[in-house]
Swiss-Prot record:
Homodimer. Interacts with NR5A1, NR5A2, NR0B2 and with COPS2. Interacts with ESRRB; represses ESRRB activity at the GATA6 promoter. A motif (AF-2 motif) lies at residues 463-468. Its main location: nucleus. A motif (LXXLL motif 2) lies at residues 80-84. The keyword Transcription applies. GO terms for cellular component: cytoplasm; membrane; nucleus; ribosome. A motif (LXXLL motif 3) lies at residues 148-152. Homodimerization involved an interaction between amino and carboxy termini involving LXXLL motifs and steroid binding domain (AF-2 motif). Heterodimerizes with NR5A1 and NROB2 through its N-terminal LXXLL motifs. It comes from the Eukaryota. This is Nuclear receptor subfamily 0 group B member 1. Residues 190-471 form the NR LBD domain.
Length: 472
């Protein structure tokens, strides 16, 4: 058969004959072929079919004749081979991997670490399925990324100093919820305290210590002399824990008020030139615009990414000066009339009363919520239509028509979300949560914050009527 080409070359019968022929070969031929240590056969050598000379009566289907050493052993990659090699590893030298790296081990995350199968050599009878031999340090420990490893590393982090978490103050605020329900202890928080708590937690990422701290509760002995009172650092303007209403104002009122005025102009232009809005009578248009101009403006300013900062004013006179500077520049010096001089003071007092810390924080929270959702241009337009066509307003005569407009706007928004291949229910819930925050924004606060330095004592209702009748 040797030296001839047979049609059965490669067939099952040919392989059986060749395997039976190799059993009677001399051992010198096998040793001359390769004198290195056998690591298992990964080639296509045929399995040994005979049972002669096999120790212990091992399963013949798992034994292969290696093409490197010529001996019968399990094939590399087989189940029996993996079990035998894993059983040999605990008895091998463990000092070799330690010389590889001298750094402390943080867990093995590679694919070379084999799980320990047997229980021999494990301290305190640990579960071997969770212990891996690390390729960095050669020790047995939980694998990095496992549940046990996470529990152990989290338990070790409790012993770290308290200065470490301060590095995470600039965390992702958009990953937190903006819901104001169930905040605080069993007594609950008031509306102003709840908004202040939300601002401290989600915007500033810090909490101010209360006055009743550990240092104040420490008893003082009789022989100790009371220390000199130190001046406590003043809390920021948004801290309402003291319960004192502090006067606040815009840090850059001219730039912010001009941006808000431009946003109001774009909002009224968007509403006025809607075909379904133009067919309404003027009185019905006024009912809609006067009730929803502030929420529409908030959506417009959020779309324009308006950023504004507040600052605390130590003296009320300074706040009055900032609120009336813009009007004095446009109208000139005011006459020396007692009644004329009392009017700006009244506006200033109302402004200091309306501009509460919680109200300003509600506006900022709404802006941050919209920015975190990445609302596109069409979604902003459909949200404005949903806010504009509100059939529950008092004084509306065409309620059915307004209901149909609101329903149609919501249907178009639904089609747009599905067209963008988004999860409809999740995206709708996110947009509804943003609209829910508009309920905490007061119209008077928007007027005093963005428009009072410009319009003075003019009513915003008169401004709406004038802008609807004018050609924008």
């Amino acid at each position: 058969m040797a030296g001839e080409d047979h049609p059965w070359h490669g067939s099952i019968l040919y392989n059986l004959l060749m395997s039976a022929k190799q059993k009677h070969g001399s051992r010198e031929e096998r040793e001359v072929r390769l004198g290195a240590q056998c690591w298992g056969c990964a080639c296509g050598t045929q399995p040994v079919l005979g049972g002669e000379g096999l120790p212990g009566g091992q399963a013949l289907s798992l034994l292969y004749r290696c093409c490197f050493c010529g001996e019968n052993h399990p094939r590399q990659g087989g189940i029996l081979y993996s079990m035998l090699t894993n059983a040999r590893q605990p008895s091998g030298a463990t000092e070799a991997p330690r010389a590889r790296f001298r750094t402390p081990c943080w867990g093995c995350a590679c694919s070379n670490a084999k799980p320990l199968v047997g229980r021999x050599g494990l301290p305190a009878g640990q579960v071997p399925s969770l212990l891996y031999r690390c390729c960095f340090c050669g020790k047995k420990h939980p694998r990095q990324g496992s549940i046990l490893y996470s529990l152990l590393t989290n338990a070790q982090q409790t012993h770290v100093s308290r200065e470490v978490p301060e590095a995470h103050r600039g965390g992702e605020w958009w990953q937190l919820s903006y819901c104001t329900h169930n905040v605080g202890g069993p007594e609950g928080l008031q509306s102003t305290q709840a908004m202040a708590f939300l601002y401290r937690s989600y915007v500033c990422c810090e909490e101010q210590p209360q006055q009743s701290s550990v240092a104040s509760d420490t008893p003082v002995r009789a022989d100790q002399t009371p220390a000199a009172p130190q001046e406590q650092p003043r809390a920021p303007w948004w801290d309402t824990s003291s319960g004192v209403q502090r006067p606040i104002a815009l840090k850059d009122p001219q730039v912010v008020c001009e941006a808000a005025s431009a946003g109001l102009l774009k909002t009224l232009r968007f509403v006025k030139y809607l075909p379904c809005f133009q067919i309404l009578p003027l009185d019905q248009q006024l009912v809609l615009v006067r009730s929803c101009w502030a929420p529409l403006l908030m959506l417009e300013l959020a779309q324009d990414h308006l950023h504004f900062e507040m600052m605390e004013i130590s003296e009320p006179n300074l706040m009055h000066e900032m609120l009336t500077t813009r009007r004095q520049e446009t109208e000139g010096p005011e006459p020396a009339d007692p009644q004329a001089t009392e009017q700006p003071q009244t506006v200033s007092a109302e402004a200091g009363h309306v501009l509460s810390v919680a109200a300003v924080q509600a506006i900022k929270s709404f802006f941050f919520k919209c920015w975190s959702l990445n609302i596109d241009t069409k979604e902003y337009a459909y949200l404005k239509g949903t806010v504009l066509f509100n059939p529950d307003l008092p004084g509306l005569q065409c309620v059915k028509y307004i209901e149909s407009l609101q329903w149609r706007t919501q249907q178009i928004l639904t089609e747009h979300i599905r067209l963008m291949q988004r999860e409809y229910q999740i995206r709708s819930a996110e947009l509804n949560s943003a609209l829910f925050l508009l309920r905490f924004i007061n119209t008077d606060v928007v007027t005093e914050l963005f428009f009072r330095p410009i319009i003075g004592a003019v009513s915003m209702d008169d401004m709406m009527l004038e802008m609807l009748c004018a050609k924008l």
